[in-house]
Swiss-Prot record:
SUPFAM superfamilies: Nucleotidylyl transferase. Keywords: ATP-binding, Cytoplasm, Ligase, Nucleotide-binding, RNA-binding, tRNA processing, tRNA-binding. The lineage of its organism: Bacteria, Bacillati, Bacillota, Bacilli, Bacillales. Its main location: cytoplasm. One of its GO terms (cellular component) is cytoplasm. Pfam families: HIGH_NTase1 (PF05636). ATP binds at residues 7-20, 101, 160, 185-186. GO terms for molecular function: ATP binding; ligase activity, forming carbon-nitrogen bonds; tRNA binding. One of its GO terms (biological process) is tRNA modification. Catalyzes the formation of N(4)-acetylcytidine (ac(4)C) at the wobble position of elongator tRNA(Met), using acetate and ATP as substrates. First activates an acetate ion to form acetyladenylate (Ac-AMP) and then transfers the acetyl group to tRNA to form ac(4)C34. It is an enzyme of class 6 (ligase). It catalyses: cytidine(34) in elongator tRNA(Met) + acetate + ATP = N(4)-acetylcytidine(34) in elongator tRNA(Met) + AMP + diphosphate. This is tRNA(Met) cytidine acetate ligase.
Length: 401
């Protein structure tokens, strides 16, 4: 069987994702579509609107054959580390291709620019440092440095272009046999906050925003199974997962932590701990808090990731230990259909990473130890007994079928 990999968050699964799955299968003629999906928190440092199990169920209904977990140490990271973890999992699963959505739509510029980054790494890094010292934020410095070392390069100001670039770069660095492919995104942009009037494809950002107001507003922008899954979760748990729900927990953490303790948290650098400590005293919402802390050097996304690390109590030392090899240490299926099950049966004897379907077998793994803390933090907003039930689901739920 031929497998193609995709890297996803499905926060939530919408019509644009459905198009991506369909076009991926069409473009690659793959027998099995494998999705590596972020678990409880996303790459931009946000709680997923519903848990991974619900999102995995949406994925199966949308045409994915096998959903595997991208654990927290790679999921809540810069694009580079996010890609390293995802590619290592797809490589372990013997995927022949990786197909991602992008604003560009052609794979050649991704390959050319990725090769430039790999083979001129030191030159690029030095240029980035020069721009950062001038007070420019990392994302902008990265783009400027890339232009300096190779004028005819990919537009990395677009979020899906930058992710795609790092997928290709990770493939090269890991010497993987995976062949990268890309599909041009249609209609909605990644950060659009409004729902389009004359189309049925909207960004996940706008869908999450309007779910806070009315479920009915988003029905035309998501597959029916997604809509039903969202409604069922809201009816059962009486909440969506978003930063405002977690803000009291974050505030408690910051108020009771010493500055020295905050300094140990992943991604905390350059004295930002003092701004965090000062701003939390008067902040009455997560949005107000981040607005008070944000600087030119610290983007909203980076601050959200820092806040996620504070909430989950993940330190620099823990992260460094977990991802030192730049590769995942296990493959954890979350959901599969018959095609996905048959594919796993075919490849599992040859896999170099353990295939784990029960969390108790990963208790001593550094990556899973962080993933476990993230799950515990994620379910903490739920009332009892729902909170305890959600924790048990993490440890006992077999892959959905």
């Amino acid at each position: 069987m031929k497998a193609v990999g995709i890297v996803v968050e499905y926060n939530p699964f919408h019509n644009g994702h459905l198009y991506h799955v369909q076009q991926t299968r069409k473009k690659t003629s793959a027998d099995c579509v494998i999705a590596v999906m972020s678990s409880s928190f996303t790459q931009r440092g946000e709680p997923a609107i519903v848990p991974k199990w619900e999102r995995a169920r949406m994925a199966l209904a949308g045409g994915v054959d096998l959903v595997v977990e991208l654990p927290y140490p790679f999921a809540v990271q810069t694009a580079e580390w996010f890609a390293q973890g995802a590619v290592s999992i797809l490589d372990a699963l013997f995927c022949e291709q990786l197909c991602f959505g992008s604003e560009h739509g052609s794979i050649e510029p991704f390959i050319k620019t990725a090769q430039l980054l790999v083979y001129k790494k030191e030159q690029h890094n030095e240029k980035v440092k020069q721009y950062v010292r001038q007070g420019i934020n990392y994302a902008k410095a990265y783009a400027l440095a890339l232009y300096d070392i190779g004028h005819d390069t990919l537009d990395v100001s677009q979020p899906n272009n930058i992710l795609g670039l790092h997928y290709v770069k990770a493939i090269i660095e890991q010497r993987s046999n995976i062949k990268p492919e890309t599909i041009q995104r249609i209609v909605a942009h990644y950060h659009d906050e409004t729902l389009p009037v004359n189309d049925n494809i909207a960004s996940a950002t706008s869908i999450r925003r309007f779910l806070q107001v009315s479920d009915d507003d988003v029905a035309r922008y998501v597959p029916h199974t997604t809509y039903e899954t969202l409604q069922t979760y809201r009816h059962t748990y009486m909440t969506w997962h978003d930063w405002e729900k977690y803000f009291p927990f974050l505030k408690y953490r910051l108020l009771t932590m010493e500055v020295d303790d905050i300094q140990q948290i992943a991604e905390v650098e350059e004295g930002i701990e003092y701004r965090l400590k000062k701003a939390i005293i008067h902040a009455t919402s997560f949005h107000d808090f981040l607005s008070a802390v944000k600087t030119k050097r610290y983007t909203w996304t980076r601050l959200q990731r820092i806040c996620t690390h504070i909430l989950t109590n993940v330190t620099k030392k823990e992260i460094a230990k977990a991802i030192e090899s730049k590769r995942a240490t296990y493959v954890r299926p979350l959901a599969m259909n018959e095609t996905g099950r048959a594919y796993l049966q075919e490849v599992k004897k040859h896999m170099t990473l353990p295939l784990v379907t029960n969390a108790k077998h990963m208790r001593h793994d550094p990556i899973y130890q962080i993933e476990k803390k993230a799950t515990q933090a994620y379910v903490s907003i739920l009332p009892e007994p729902l909170c305890s039930e959600a924790l048990q689901r993490e440890y006992k739920t077999p892959p959905l079928r």
